[in-house]
Amino acid sequence: MCIRDSQCPTILDNGFGGHRIEGIGDKHIPWVHNVKNTDMVIDIDDEDSQRLLRLFNCKEGQEYLKTLGLSDEQIEKFTWMGISGIANVLCCIKFAKFYELTEDDVVVTVLTDSAVMYKSRVEELNEMYGAYSAQAAELDHNLHMLNLKTDSMLELTYPERKRVHNLKYYTWVEQQGMSVEDLNAQWYDTKNTWDAVHAQAKELDELINAFNDEVGLLKAL
């Protein structure tokens, strides 16, 4: 499942534009995206993630969440989600609605960032929309989470996946000097491309652990 923004629907319909979801590339298909292994693309309006960032990180929003029966511990965990993480969760909600999932199903995503990175963005939103309130929190919750629809979603068939994969040519071959052979290998030779990358997991974990030990950030947590 690939998550993008509806303001720049490159995968969905070859669209272009700008957006405010950090970490999502604009107007191109990343070289390291295994498109052949992508079953669905889901686009989310960047306004949804912005509004919920504010809901989860403003005192008034957190007080509203308490009225829904959430504990302080649960509310604190919402601050673990940054803009991209919120977008991922919202797309999981759309995914669950699309496939009519129930409490017996499990959907897993990744929280790729934390709200700690976006304190200035929350301040910008407060300046843009004015002081936050319980009424605004209730509106944001209902409009930008509960009201999510199954729009801007596409199950990718084999030809559609290849259409998306071929978009890499214009960025990576024409502009960045990658070869057509390398591009074709990503599609036709998965054993020596994507599978080979996955086989490096143990080595990559060791490098990550060594880096974390060197910088010492995890020791402070």
Language-model features and meaning:
Residues 97-104:
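Non-catalytic interaction/regulatory modules that flank or connect domains
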